[in-house]
Amino acid sequence: MRVSRSGVFGVLLVVVVLATLGGYSFYRGYAAGASRLGRVMAWLRNPGAHPDWALQAGDRCGNAPFAYPTDGFIGFLWGDSFRPGHRHQGLDIFGGQELGQTPVLAAYPGFLTRLPDWKASLIIRLPQDPLQPDRQIWTYYTHMADEQGNSYIAPAFPPGTQELYVEAGTLLGYQGNYSGDPDNPTGIHLHFSIVLDDGGGSFRNELEIENTLDPSPYLGLPLSAETNQGEIPSCG
């Protein structure tokens, strides 16, 4: 989710218009998203004022199988929407530090791939879904580069890396703001998602929410916008 000034005003305008036209049931989801947007802006302005919002990389919530992949505040959830037809496919976690400073760790062991043209992204194959062992899934990590595409991915994973085994907690890189458009970078964060297998041993298109999974049970937190109507994700 981009958090440039123009983007913020655009999102708020969409929320107001849809609230007027769509009625309460339609508005409720957008209102929750707008509430999260306000918190993201507050966090980016002064992370130190909200230490209770932050999660620590490598920690786990109870018996959840995945560790938190990075430090920071989970600002936007799976299923969040700020325009008609769009639903966010994963989580946006904002570290609150400068570019290239907030570590990104593997949430679960698996086999890492970085495609040759990936400047900011990695994907890890999990041969057995820990919650449904009869299927294979993938964990996806992105925005690990600056606005010009200078990568913050760890040197151990150069472009073209294929099927390299990594343990949970392995350093993958650092949070960045790469969007593909140098004139409109994202806020500094990690986008993390869980992607379904295509049935042929590869991953589906992560840009479509139907190809991703609700991360709530994997991280033990309320991370679906459909059911989380403004709660700050925390363990306990």
Question: Where are each of the predicted segments found?
Answer:
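N-terminal Sec-pathway targeting helices
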Residues: 1-17
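Hydrophobic alpha-helical membrane-insertion segments, chiefly the h-region
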Residues: 15-28
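Surface-exposed, glycine-biased beta-strand/turn segments
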Residues: 25-121, 127-129, 168, 177, ...
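Acidic, glycine-rich catalytic/binding loops that coordinate metals and/or anionic ligands
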Residues: 39, 136-137, 150, 156-170, ...
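Non-catalytic surface loops within mature trypsin-like serine protease
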Residues: 95-97, 128, 145-146, 192, ...
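A generic structural signal for short coil/turn motifs at secondary-structure boundaries
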Residues: 100, 148-152, 181-183
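Zn2+-dependent peptidoglycan hydrolase active-site motif and core
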Residues: 106-159, 188-189
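Active-site loop architecture of trypsin-fold serine endopeptidases
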Residues: 175-189
